[in-house]
């Protein structure tokens, strides 16, 4: 029986789920996640949360008996099932107001039904990709990138997952493209880069131009694959 079970695990095609909370299509976050998924060399699925209807968890605990949300009939149930069926998961987000975005937060909370009695996410390899507009050298502002990584990492740790690593990307403050970034008195450009900064002087940060982030995304994918291989 043990030999048969091992053979079944060996024959099973591994699948890695990648979930992006970025609402912008083809964003830095999306492209980094897709690169990490590609680097696994395994079957993958890319989920764009903005394309789904996800309500927040209502903390009713009605999911205890069935491991399934009973309080809101939305896409959160489908997404939780995808996470349950996947062998590994990478969560990618951006960090408005120095924390993970609302779509990613709602997604994580809606995975709560998978916890009860069975721990369906336990043991699965997982990773994080976080985009932050605040450069690491700016110590006057909150370390939003680190805070985003921690939010995802702590979720995975609390569910008993095997957190294998994180990727941090330097993103772009929305004020760069709103049309008023240079003159708005609450401009994020001024807050982050100083009063003399302009849309033109700050420019646009692209994932592909950040070599450390590129390497880290590929390495994350390889680590996910390695952790899955070690389980077989």
Language-model-derived ranges and their functions:
Residues 2-120, 172-176, 187-232:
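N-terminal beta1-alpha1-beta2 submodule of the flavodoxin-like/Rossmannoid cofactor-binding fold
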Residues 120-170:
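Short, glycine-/small-residue-rich phosphate/pyrophosphate-handling segment
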């Amino acid at each position: 029986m043990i030999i048969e079970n091992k053979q079944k695990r060996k024959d099973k095609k591994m699948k890695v789920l990648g979930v992006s909370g970025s609402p912008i299509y083809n964003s830095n976050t999306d492209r980094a996640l897709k690169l990490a998924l590609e680097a696994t060399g395994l079957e993958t699925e890319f989920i764009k949360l903005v394309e789904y209807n996800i309500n927040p968890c209502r903390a009713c605990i009605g999911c205890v008996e069935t491991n399934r949300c009973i309080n809101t009939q939305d896409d959160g149930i489908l997404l939780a099932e995808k996470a349950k069926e996947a062998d590994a998961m990478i969560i990618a987000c951006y960090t408005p107001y120095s924390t993970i975005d609302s779509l990613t937060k709602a997604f994580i909370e809606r995975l709560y039904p998978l916890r009860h009695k069975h721990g369906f996410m336990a043991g699965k390899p997982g990773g994080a990709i976080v985009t932050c507009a605040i450069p690491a050298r700016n110590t006057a502002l909150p370390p939003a990138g680190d805070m985003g990584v921690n939010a995802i990492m702590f979720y995975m740790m609390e569910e008993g997952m095997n957190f294998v690593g994180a990727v941090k990307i330097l993103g772009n403050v929305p004020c760069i493209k709103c049309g008023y970034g240079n003159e708005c008195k609450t401009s994020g450009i001024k807050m982050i880069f100083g009063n003399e900064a302009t849309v033109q002087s700050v420019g646009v940060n692209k994932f592909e131009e950040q070599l450390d982030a590129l390497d880290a995304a590929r390495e994350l994918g390889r680590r996910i694959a390695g952790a899955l291989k070690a389980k077989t």
